[in-house]
């Protein structure tokens, strides 16, 4: 910490600006990192940010994303990064080093141990991109105990109240994000012209130095930021690009040359604009009174799960959304507007006694909650309609969404068509391939709706969420992110649940009307968990009702090709929320698999995580094979073609029904219809035909 303070003191005495340089550890090769660190110092870097690679860097642009991907392929983990710092120190590195990255690898390593080991390795502090302020107070205290700095981030969107709080927990400097959006720079794009105003606003609350990053690539841009009043200039993406452009053996020299050029090392001292570094001292200290600025108006956690683990740029947008949702759900006129759309969405959905399925099971009555009969073919329309009304309340004109199976994409594009809003759907390239029908449906809904395939990672739902969040942070002023499942940072899990809980409310009323009782068991498939939390929520206080969530077991949970997050995962942080996730020992998110695109996700809603840990709900797995058996069973016994997602719940529901007496009642949420999956199954069936003893002629299917 003291070394960082000393840098800024020396620069102030020289009327100069500190150069803060970022690189990703292990990029492009593991053995390049130490020479690159030394080259940064030789080229004029006063402080170095060393990036800890993460599988899902939602705040970063394409350049840093690629560097993270390459570094992970080079087996770079937290202990390796610390080892590189030790080696660099031994070889003469004296510049302060800040470890910069995302929270989950730290959480997996152990927060206390991560801080202690960093200090022992020679690091000087941390920048945690997605560590929320509420957590940061405790984290900062632990850092201070090891003489390490905690560097908070402030964005152009940060409110004065939050600036006051964030300034109060800064000890060495504050990282000021110059623009909304992800990391990245261009020599042809000017730095934000509002930067002087942003810096002046922050200086009203702190005397701590301010270092500005995002968007700086050239010496002229460096000087502009310095003249705007910055005490330091952060450059990252441009350095990573220089590394990429270098040939084998040339990386250190390329890095040093660029750093010399941009920092002006070796050139005559440059006089900054008058008044560039004026400061207003502050006596603020971190305390409970200051921290009140970040309190939530709706409960942000379910036990230990939930929260807002997001980049600073998103915090105020989430607060705006939370306030709008609270206002809406307390407004009878809002719910009247929602209910007025039931004739459009075909609510209430029917509760159907599956007599043939019941007879097949030979046990409890099997009831199907027919969400598949909703407009657009699934439960997703419930949430889409609710959120589109929220978006209109806060004046958004552009809607983005992620989708896996495509059902949420279709529902979102549908409501955008109805309300005349622009619509962009992010979908993993693999899901685009296996859900081609839904892609066509989305794009058929009008010129304002289109699908953007995502080619990163496993090219599935997780990666679509990453890209949607990057879009949102870049376009907050006009855009609402219409999250499709009960995932993501607060208040998204609560919002989605509130618009899906109609499922359980209707089940309770409908079964009481025909049976005069509560169901004994309710069953729903679980990916992110929207249809399941909608089914379960109204029954949580009813202890006599067993709640069963069915996860995607893929090819079996004895291997890694599954999506059984609650059954096989561990608590961690992904996509802005603390919940159960599928991760390796280093805290990197692992690729998942399911025959159903909608369940192919390595996380789950935080309320499900709480229901699991509290014992209120049971979560089991259903393999691809058994899901196909469930699909076939319902199709041939009842003449109802279910979505592959719902087929997981069908299989488990019938299995449970077999174990119960005939006077019991089990309700299965049939979350969607299977039209979208028919082509995929026709392609898969030859592989499964003998194992399932299911031979269907495909002569009627046109060849491609």
Curated annotation (Swiss-Prot):
Reactions accelerated catalytically: (1S,2R)-1-C-(indol-3-yl)glycerol 3-phosphate + L-serine = D-glyceraldehyde 3-phosphate + L-tryptophan + H2O
Enzyme class: lyase
GO CC, one annotated term: cytoplasm
Cofactor(s) needed for function: pyridoxal 5'-phosphate
Ranges for region Tryptophan synthase alpha chain: 1-292
Pfam family, one: Trp_syntA
Gene3D superfamilies linked: 3.40.50.1100, Aldolase class I
Region described as Tryptophan synthase beta chain: 293-704
Pathway: Amino-acid biosynthesis; L-tryptophan biosynthesis; L-tryptophan from chorismate: step 5/5
N6-(pyridoxal phosphate)lysine found at: 380
Family: In the N-terminal section; belongs to the TrpA family. In the C-terminal section; belongs to the TrpB family.
HAMAP family, per the entry: Trp_synth_alpha, Trp_synth_beta
Protein name: Tryptophan synthase
Organism: Coprinopsis cinerea (strain Okayama-7 / 130 / ATCC MYA-4618 / FGSC 9003)
Protein's gene: TRP-1
